[in-house]
Amino acid sequence: MKNRVYESLTTVFSVLVVSSFLYIWFATY
């Protein structure tokens, strides 16, 4: 159960990082 929550949190965190990186890249382009 705890491993499942950690896995989902890691997925959400990576998605946020990628989306913010793409947003900054498009904004500065």
From Swiss-Prot:
Give the highest taxon in the source lineage: Bacteria
Q: Which GO terms describe its molecular function?
A: enzyme inhibitor activity
Please provide, in alphabetical order, the Gene Ontology terms of the cellular component aspect for this entry.
plasma membrane
The name on file for this protein is: Putative membrane protein PmrR
Task: Tell me the function of this protein.
Answer: May bind to BasS and modulate its sensor kinase activity.
Question: Lineage, please?
Answer: Bacteria, Pseudomonadati, Pseudomonadota, Gammaproteobacteria, Enterobacterales
Which residue ranges traverse the bilayer? Answer: 5-27
The answer, when asked if Transmembrane helix is one of the entry's keywords, is yes
